[in-house]
Structures are given as C-alpha cells and as structure tokens.
Amino acid sequence: SDLGEDNYFEMKKYIVIVFTGLLMSIPALAQLFWNKANMRNVKMQIDKQPYKSAYDALIKKADLYLLEPHLSVVNDKDHIPASGDIHDYMSIGRYTWPDTTKADGLPYIERDGYTNPEYYTYDREVLLKMVDRVKTFTLAWYFSDDSRYASAAVGQIRVWFLKKETYMNPNMYYGQIVKGYTYLNATAVLDGAGFVDMIDALYLLDDYHSWMWHRDLKRVKKWFGQFLDWIETSDQGVRQNKSRDNTGTSYDLQRLAYNLYCGRVENAQEILNNFVEKRILKQIDDEGVQVEEIKRTSSFGYSVSNISVMMNFIIIACNQGLQLTPESLTRFYKAVNYLIPYLDENKQWPYQEISNMKYYRKRLCFELFRIETCIDKSKTNYLKLYEKYGKMSDNDINVLLY
C-alpha cells in the first residue's frame, strides 16, 4: 500500500525500530557491495561458464594495467588550483561552459546536460581511472591468487593516498569549480563518490599478507577518516547535506561508506535510520516520480542514476545485516516501477531527455537484477525484465560479483 501522510509518522517510527541496534554486531570487515560468500563460490567455478568469460576479460584488463605507471593527483595534473598546492584535487563543473558573449569567456555559464570537454582534462577522470585500476587489480588477485595483482593494487593505493611526492590532500575544496567565480561549490563533495567504489577492494586487500601493507592500510583508513571529517564539517559538505535531489543521496552514500570503513558505527547507524525519511520520502512522490530529477534536461538518466545510488545504499544496509522490509521501501519500489515501462523504446518518456536513453535503459535493467539478487528474491518479474531488455554480457565483470 502507499505510504501516505496518515501513516507517515508510524512508518518513520517503524523504520527506526528496524534499524536501531543492529549495526553494533557488524563484522569488522563486512563488504559494502561485494558478496564475499558468493565470490568464494564463483572462485571455485572460475574456469567454467558463466564465469570464465568474465574472468578472462578481468585478467586481460588487469594485465594491460600492469604495463602502465600508477596514476596520481600530482603527476597527471594539467591544472593547478587557486591554493597553488599540486596535492589539492581539482575539477570543473561538468556542465559549465565559456560564455561566448564575453571576450575571455568568464564567468562560465551552465548548460545542463551538456558536458564541456574541458571536464576530462581535470583530476576527476584520473580519480575514476585510479579507482578502476584498484578494483581491477584486487579482483584479479582474488580470483587468480596471483600476488602480482595485489602488489599492483597496493602500489596504486600508496601513490594516490600515501606517497609524499604524489598523495592527494584529504579534501575536495576545489572540486567542480565554476571558472570566473571564487566561491567553493557544494557539489565538489560529489566527486568523492568515486572512492566508494574502491572501499570493497580495501576490505578484500586486508587478506593480502604483507606486514608493510597492513601498516599502510591503517594510514589509508586514517586518510579516509580525515576526508570524512571534511565531508561532514566543511561549509561545502554542510551545504550539500541540505540537497533534496540525487546529489543529497550521493552525499549520504559517501558518509555511510566511509563511516563504516572507519569504524564509526554509531554515525553509520544514524545515517541509515534517517535514510528513508530524509532521502526516499522527500525525493519520490506518491506516484513514484522523482520530483527534482524530472526537472533536468536528462531527466530519465538522472532518475535512473538516483535509483542506482539508492540501491547502493540499500545493498550496504543489507550486507551489514539490516533487515529492510518491503514496507519500508514502498516509495522506492514505486520509483522503480514508474521507470519500468520506458524500458520499451517505443514508449515515450514524458519529460526532457537529451542523453542516451539506451544506456540508461540498460543501467535500469542492471538495478532490477540487483534488486532481485541482493534485496528481494520475490521480485522475479524484475529478473525477467532484466533478461528481456538488458542482460549483462558474458564478459561483464559484475558476473563475478553478484
């Protein structure tokens, strides 16, 4: 049934009861997204389909990465932030462009949904590539037992976070700047979301037996603690926390992931307790429409992307042993169901969409797969839709993880 205003406060109370106290028994190294028990089963059958193709693709990718130097926020920097410190992360707003009516193009103006090619010359792209390397090396090591890959993952982590010459300062003050303005953007915090994707690799690398690495791993955790402090207490972070769209969801996902990784269990529990009320109920209306996302020029894309972030949040909760009931996720499922008819390319999306619908349809299919696989096995209809409209290819690395 719909979560209307009449039972809103009762449901809020129920959700808090569901969450309270359960985090205290979380294992010290519980994975965020990756299901380690499932990965162990996959590993025992890695030379058989449906896993062999994905494994071969993983190893091929890792071997190519082995040939390349480690990435850093220092060595691969094309632009220097206002601080003059090359260790400071820097990016520009993705949709900001030179003002063609001005001789110098300044200040930049917003063109929502249109990516300025300059965006790719800043640190954001390097960060995402670094995260992908750490994940790829770590998974290649786990499934192959070849220590070369673990060594490469550890080396990349040291270069980005620890090495004196190349480390990144634990903040993003100069993220998503708008050229021509001096203010610091609240959305800078969002660039850190890429780090969430490598936390599971850090957990897995705890099993890599190297005395020096375990010493360094403590330093990495300290770095993330400092980064988390910046996210939660800086003016940019405080402002971002008030966001009522996908950026607010992403902000809380980072906070949840880093609090868990740093062992700040009570903080993580508070974030979980507030999630349904603070994010889901305020972003999704009774019909399942994500009211802020449909205002965007890429409204379907942002609606799907926000579902993906919410899914990450929910999967983390489930993997930490929290029992999320279907009742507590009523509004979330409404949002998913609202998008499903538009998997059919003949069905016209009623709002503006300038981006690649095909890409986001496939991404929605992946979320339907994750819902059935990770959250609710009764959602067999979601699995059928996934298989009909956007099943993963055999060489997709996610085949090994879910």
PLM features: residue spans?
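Positively charged n-region of N-terminal signal peptides that target proteins for export
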Residues: E10-Y14
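Bacterial N-terminal signal peptides
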Residues: I17-S25
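Extracellular glycan-targeting catalytic surfaces
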Residues: A30-V238, N273-V276, I284, I316-N319, ...
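Loop-centered beta-sheet repeat module
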Residues: W223-N259
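Long, repeat-rich segments with strong aromatic
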Residues: S250-P350
